[in-house]
Amino acid sequence: MKVSLVKEQTVRNYANKHAEARASCVDFINRIKTADWEKPNNIKATFGSVDLLGKGTYRAVFDIGGNNHRFICKYRFGKRSVRLYVLWLGTHAEYTVLCDKEQQYTADNHEKYI
């Protein structure tokens, strides 16, 4: 199924604030635009370095820019398409702090980049 990236502009704004991640952010967007997913494991086929979080969160953590940045997105598989919602964007160091506090399951900072 076709994948739609919700809040694509948020990723672009993040890239503008983190120039070193710009090319990787564009690559992330382009991969999403050409993705064809039927189930969550297909996300791993598109992005080899992605972690699917458990606990019924329907969240995926994407490694961006050589593992220097992380994006947390929520995925929703519908009848005809998949929607990928950008929830959290940050550096690897910020993500580590998030995980130390076990907040990766609930984190949401995308408004910072709107």
List the predicted regions and their residue ranges:
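Basic, Lys/Arg-enriched alpha-helical interface segments
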Residues: M1-N68, F77-R83, H92-I114
